[in-house]
């Protein structure tokens, strides 16, 4: 099982979401505890990170397998996620 760490920029992103998107993203984040590389997640090109779709939003995170931690660093709308 992985420990989930929500970094301050991701917490700010999460705080701005409407209730429905918030609930969907929290479900996805909780699922990362069991599987840090779930089906549908992708390794980011040119970065040390992964992305996971949650409706119109993307959860951007890094995996530390040595310490069994997932660092969530951003939660962005898909149009803003990669800029």
What is the predicted function of each stretch?
Residues 28-53:
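A short, surface-exposed loop/turn module that caps and links secondary-structure elements
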Residues 1-23, 53-54, 62-83:
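Enriched for short, Lys/Arg-rich terminal
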């Amino acid at each position: 099982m992985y420990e989930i760490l929500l970094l301050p920029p991701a917490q700010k992103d999460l705080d701005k979401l409407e209730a429905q998107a918030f609930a969907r993203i929290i479900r996805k984040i909780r699922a990362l505890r069991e599987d840090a590389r779930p089906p549908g997640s992708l390794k980011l090109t040119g970065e040390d990170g992964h992305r996971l779709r949650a409706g119109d939003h993307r959860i951007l995170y890094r995996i530390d397998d040595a310490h069994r931690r997932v660092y969530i660093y951003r939660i962005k709308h898909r149009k803003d996620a990669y800029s």
